[in-house]
Amino acid sequence: MVKREDTDDTSTQAVDGAEVESNGQGDAGTDSSPWSIESETVLFNSLCKFKPVGIHKHFRMISLSASLNYYFSESPKDAPVFSHQDVWDKLGTLYDLDGLDELEYVADNQDSDMDEDEDDEAAIEGIAKRSQMKEFVLPFRDYGFLQIEQATAVASEQSSPAMSREQSVLEDGPTAGDEKKGLADDDDESSDLDELDDEEMKLAETKIKVEGEQQEREENGGEEEHDTMEGSAEPEEAEKSEEEGEGEESGESESESGSESQSDSDAQTGRQRRTRAATAAAVRGRGTSKGKTVRDKKSSPSTRASSAPRRSTRRKATTEPEDTATEREETPTPKKSSGGVKKPAPRRSTRRKK
C-alpha cells in the first residue's frame, strides 16, 4: 500500500514536472519571438510595397526583410533582426501562401482558365486588377462648386488683416463716375494745351512774316536811296567839274556819304537777319515746320521779283553820258584815314552868285 502510494506520488510528481518544463519552454519561446505590434505593423506596410507571391516571390522577400531590418536599424541595441525564414513563418501563420501562388499564376494566365465558373473569373480579375484601382474622388460635376467655395473661404480666413484693409481701400476707391470725370478733365487740359500751342505758333508765324516784310521793305528802300543818290550825284558832279577844287571836295563828300549810308544799311540788315534767325530757331525748337514754309515763301520767285525795279534803276543809272562817265573815272577815289572813316565835309553850293 505504501509502495503503491509512493509510486502514485512519484508518478504524479513526474507529470507535474514535465508540465512545468513544457510551460517554461513555451514562455521562453514566446519571450524570444521578435514579433510585436510595431513589427507586425511594419510588416503589413512592407507587404503593400513588396508582395511575396508568384514567380518573383523570393526576390520580393529579400526586399521585404531588408525593409523590416532598415526600420529597426535606428532603434537601440536590443532591436530585433528578421531573417527570411522568420518572415516566411509569420506569413504562413497569417495567409495561405500556396493558395495565393495559385491565384497569382491563374491571374498571369487568364487565357488558359476560360472554362472556370463566372464567380471564380470575377475573383481572379479583381485580384489581377488590384494594382490598377484608382483612388475614389467625388465627381466634380456634382461637388466641384462646393469644393471651390470651401477653398476660397479657407483662403479668406487665412489672409492677413493688412490684406483685408488693402482690399477695403481698393473697394472704397473712386467710382465709375469719378473716373469718367477725371478722364474728361484730362481731355480738357490737353485740348487747352493744344490751343495754347497753336496760338503761340500763329503769333510766331505772324511775327516772322511781319519782320520779313519789314526787312524786304528796308532793303528795297535802301537800294532805291542808293540808286537815287548815285543818279543825283551825276548832275552835281557835272556842275562841280566847272570848278576843279570845289568839284573834288564835293565828290569826296558824296562818295563818303554814300559809303556811310551803305555801311549803315548793311549793319541794319545784319541785325535784322540775326533777329530773324533767332526767332526761326525758337520756332524750330518747338517741333513745327510752319516757319520753314514762311522762309520758303520769302525765297520764292515772287519775292525775287521785287528786285526787278532795282535792276532797272541800276541800268538807268549806268546809262549816263560819256562826258560824265569820263569825269567820274578821272575823279580820284576817297582814301580812308588810319583813324577810321572820314567825316564828310559840309556841302558847298556850286552855283555862282549872280
Swiss-Prot record:
Biased composition (Basic and acidic residues): 201-220
Subcellular location: Nucleus
Stretches assigned to coiled coil: none
Alphabetical GO biological process terms: chromatin organization; DNA repair; regulation of transcription by RNA polymerase II
Chief place of localization: nucleus
Pfam family, one: Eaf7
Keywords carried by this UniProt record: Chromatin regulator, DNA damage, DNA repair, Nucleus, Transcription, Transcription regulation
Function as written in the Swiss-Prot or TrEMBL entry: Component of the NuA4 histone acetyltransferase complex which is involved in transcriptional activation of selected genes principally by acetylation of nucleosomal histone H4 and H2A. The NuA4 complex is also involved in DNA repair.
Subunit structure: Component of the NuA4 histone acetyltransferase complex.
Protein name: Chromatin modification-related protein EAF7
UniProt source species: Yarrowia lipolytica (strain CLIB 122 / E 150) (Yeast)
Encoding gene (name): EAF7
